[in-house]
Amino acid sequence: MPAESTFDIVSDFERQELVNAIDQARREVATRYDLKDTKTEIVLSEKELTITTESEMHLAAVRDLVQTKALRRNLSIKIFKFGPVQEVSGGRVRQVATLQRGIPEDVAKKLAKLIRDHFPKVQPRIQGDALRVGSKSRDELQAVIRLVKERQDEFDIPLQFTNYR
């Protein structure tokens, strides 16, 4: 009888690719005609991205620019969870985006229930901010991957599959 095969469902992104996308966005903001004199700041910290500029119109343009640059570097735009627009001193506006990393517990429970409902012989286990899925049949695991990829739009986080053993 074969040993159990497993894989992990995670939500993560390549940090260096995000840094590169933000650098490209900063360069484009500095050279683009409609954004050149807006004193726009794009600040990337460990867990969030802050965009500060002169008006909500410029803010929307910079936000779209950042998302476009991220998409071109194969990053999902679901990693950005944008908060409300805030007024700051000098008539400027700011928006903070939290960077999504790891699967929140409520999403992990929904994923585990989805997998259990469709595949009773497969065991999904929540391990911190990842979901480990195990089964004796590799075919069932591949079917689970197909199911989760098809239903990925139901979850507001990007999902990847790693450690397939």
Swiss-Prot record:
Q: Which domain of life is it from?
A: Bacteria
Q: Which SUPFAM superfamilies does this one have? A: YajQ-like
Q: Do you know which InterPro entries this protein is assigned to?
A: DUF520, UPF0234-like_C, UPF0234_N, YajQ-like_sf
The alphabetized UniProt keywords are: Nucleotide-binding
Entry GO terms, CC: cytosol
**What CDD domains has UniProt attached to this entry?**
YajQ_like
Q: What protein family is recorded?
A: Belongs to the YajQ family.
Q: What does this protein do?
A: Nucleotide-binding protein.
Entries under HAMAP family matching the protein: YajQ (MF_00632)
Under what name is this protein listed? Nucleotide-binding protein Rcas_1283
Lineage, top ranks: Bacteria, Bacillati, Chloroflexota, Chloroflexia, Chloroflexales
